[in-house]
Amino acid sequence: MASGKEIRTQIGSIKNTQKITSAMEMVAASKMRRAQDRMELGKPYASRMRAVVGHLANGNPEYKHLYLQEREVKRVGYIIVSSDRGLCGGLNVNVFKQVIVHSKAWADKGVGVDLCMIGAKGTSFFNSVGGNIVASVRDIGEKPKVSDLIGSVKVMLDAFAEQKIDKLYLVGNEFVNTMTQLPSVEQLLPLQPDEDKKLQHQWDYIYEPEARELLDGLLVRYIESQVYQAVVENGACEQAARMIAMKNATDNAGDLIDGLQLVYNKARQAAITQELSEIVSGAAAV
């Protein structure tokens, strides 16, 4: 059994770690609320952009933009959103597993896979497993900007336009609530028909310049907005997952301290009992 001094040292060390994890939990909770606000602020823009693109596409059915055309799939691309830092539980691992399963289904059909990475953790992981990374961006911070993402997104859009890839997917985390974040895979290109019944009416807007020119520009902006929204939402997921991970670490540290305190008390009791026994034995000998 360890000595009382060793146990006290262990308890002190764990208490110091517990203070750190508790502080990190509070910081993550504060950052999560701000990230949620950014996520909610971005949703109306992305939703409205989708509606406008839908109106334009429905109002001009004879015009099939390249981003709307289905073709034989020979190669697919993935834009993968991960965090730059760790200590957020299985958040990134769940996304990576989803990518591996999804891409394997294509690979089994003889389809090649290209990857665009957003976040240091994803870049590190797929470099280690031999993924074909064609673009990457990292260190975008807690307040990402669309301008930070445009370069990497453009690489994938150009690849689709040049028919180097035939489908483009966006993979990230969906924020359900503080306790639940789910990995999601969404097809970005070619764009899927909008099932919203609100878009099935017959009226249309009058656009300047003409709708076709506007659609060309809006489709690119729409893809960029979807990627940006995924990055912002992943940021909220990251802070929520980190808060839960640090709470669990703090609770586990408390359990360890309780267990070590019990061991220390038993060791101290045994030492006192032994001393009393020696005193009694010495008195009896006299």
UniProtKB/Swiss-Prot annotation:
Protein's cellular compartments: Cell inner membrane
Record PANTHER family: ATP SYNTHASE GAMMA CHAIN, ATP SYNTHASE SUBUNIT GAMMA, MITOCHONDRIAL
Domain of life of the native organism: Bacteria
GO molecular function: ATP binding; proton-transporting ATP synthase activity, rotational mechanism
PROSITE patterns: ATPASE_GAMMA
Species: Saccharophagus degradans (strain 2-40 / ATCC 43961 / DSM 17024)
Name assigned to this protein: ATP synthase gamma chain
CDD domains, A to Z: F1-ATPase_gamma
Subunit organization: F-type ATPases have 2 components, CF(1) - the catalytic core - and CF(0) - the membrane proton channel. CF(1) has five subunits: alpha(3), beta(3), gamma(1), delta(1), epsilon(1). CF(0) has three main subunits: a, b and c.
Function according to Swiss-Prot or TrEMBL: Produces ATP from ADP in the presence of a proton gradient across the membrane. The gamma chain is believed to be important in regulating ATPase activity and the flow of protons through the CF(0) complex.
Keywords: ATP synthesis, Cell inner membrane, Cell membrane, CF(1), Hydrogen ion transport, Ion transport, Membrane, Transport
Record-level GO BP terms: proton motive force-driven plasma membrane ATP synthesis
Name of the gene this protein is made from: atpG
Topological relation to the membrane, as annotated: Peripheral membrane protein
